């Protein structure tokens, strides 16, 4: 299993959990972003800087990932694409995207986009909480235990 982070929008606290997990389990972890992100020195942790532009990092993750890899992202369309390739997708809040729930999540996302386009302000997600961090770490541990 290889780990990929959609790193431009991934909270620092979640990246740090992933750094520790990659070291502990000796799994390769790729941070894919259009800006340089500081990483610890490790033969398991790699920074992949892509050009700027819409979905450039997402396309790179889809290109690189394989079945049974784990992608950390809150980007629903990216999660859908990697699931179609047989990979797993986990949000920074600990929600596992699956073939069974991804279509519903895409529909909700599209509905919210339509509402925003019509001028209705929906606000963004709340800040990452300690409960979110724990949910993420617990779910990550369960996924890595099966690798």
Swiss-Prot record:
Q: A Pfam family matched by this chain, by name?
A: DUF188
Q: Which InterPro entries match?
A: UPF0178
Q: Which CDD domains match?
A: PIN_YqxD-like
Domain of life (superkingdom):
Bacteria
Q: Which PANTHER family match?
A: UPF0178 PROTEIN YAII
- Family designation: Belongs to the UPF0178 family.
Name this protein carries in UniProt? UPF0178 protein IL2341
